[in-house]
Amino acid sequence: MAGTVTVPGSSTPSTPLLKDELDIVIPTIRNLDFLEMWRAFFQPYHLIIVQDGDPTKTIKVPEGFDYELYNRNDINRILGPKASCISFKDSACRCFGYMVSKKKYIYTIDDDCFVAKDPSGKDINALEQHIKNLLSPSTPFFFNTLYDPYREGADFVRGYPFSLREGAHTAVSHGLWLNIPDYDAPTQLVKPKERNERYVDAVMTIPKGTLFPMCGMNLAFDRDLIGPAMYFGLMGDGQPIGRYDDMWAGWCVKVICDHLSLGVKTGLPYIWHSKASNPFVNLKKEYKGIFWQEDIIPFFQNVTIPKDCDTVQKCYIYLSGQVKEKLGTIDPYFVKLGDAMVTWIEAWDELNPSTPAAANGKAK
């Protein structure tokens, strides 16, 4: 049974700790010294570390953490021929951790992300805030101008339909970052010294029908609700594109959440993004994507999932066919990606045979 977190000075428990219901997934190519900073918040949880790059390299993990570590040899051994759907030499490999997890919730973070401080100077427990976000409803069908109406001190404003005040199940909690912003390469080149210093104390639901650029470095989700759609695509080694892995997953996830009446939140919590990646290397990875996204985004804005697609898997398989048909004319890469999306679902179902992700809502 999960424990609880009690607010100092309060006799009432606030957020369930979900100690036995949540895995932390970390993709890495280096020693995980950054975990020392997170020890107070992460040590109670199980970690799934996905080692990218050279599988003969030893990744050092600080003592005292409960973890399992998978390298490329492990991925090939577990998935066999289906391992082709897991990216190599790209942080997109993290989605393998989502697949092998057996927990209800996932939190994923990059190894260059440190504990941030709120305006009062207090360390931010990012994981606790993500749990709060996931365990409270979302409001995707009607925008509340006070943002999160379920937060203490807030409510639904005048004119908000009473029939919608129960909200929807929350599938995704998308956190933000202080210091180094998550910019594309052209923006990095124009603003090399820009830092995000604005702390906005808010969580909001992204409205139904609105897409967003999902970032995977501070992200939590309900694996039971949306896990099979959290595929980070084919990126990195041998592929014509990179740095679109989390955004691709986010577009797929948002379209499916809209169809299944699930919610996606963004805002708190913040982490401290410690270092900027090389904008020239990034430009090479992103170059094709910068042009392709002008077709990709309208594709997701206009795709309509049939009503008989009532599970995440069915929705995702339908999307894969549409990707091949509608985006395959742009570049053969999208035909390959559509096939990989099917392979991903097949691999997911093989490793998770008794828990297919079904909608708690109903298809719209």
UniProtKB/Swiss-Prot annotation:
One of its GO terms (molecular function) is UDP-arabinopyranose mutase activity. Reversibly glycosylated by UDP-glucose, UDP-xylose and UDP-galactose. GO terms for biological process: cell wall organization; cellulose biosynthetic process; plant-type cell wall organization or biogenesis; UDP-L-arabinose metabolic process. A motif (DXD motif) lies at residues 110-112. It catalyses: UDP-beta-L-arabinofuranose = UDP-beta-L-arabinopyranose. It is an enzyme of class 5 (isomerase). Pfam families: RGP. The keyword Glycoprotein applies. The record marks R158, R165 as: Required for activity. It is found in: Secreted, Cell wall; Cell junction, Plasmodesma; Golgi apparatus. The conserved DXD motif is involved in enzyme activity. Probable UDP-L-arabinose mutase involved in the biosynthesis of cell wall non-cellulosic polysaccharides. Was initially shown to possess an autoglycosylating activity which is dependent on the presence of UDP-glucose and manganese. This is Probable UDP-arabinopyranose mutase 1. It comes from Zea mays. The gene is UPTG.
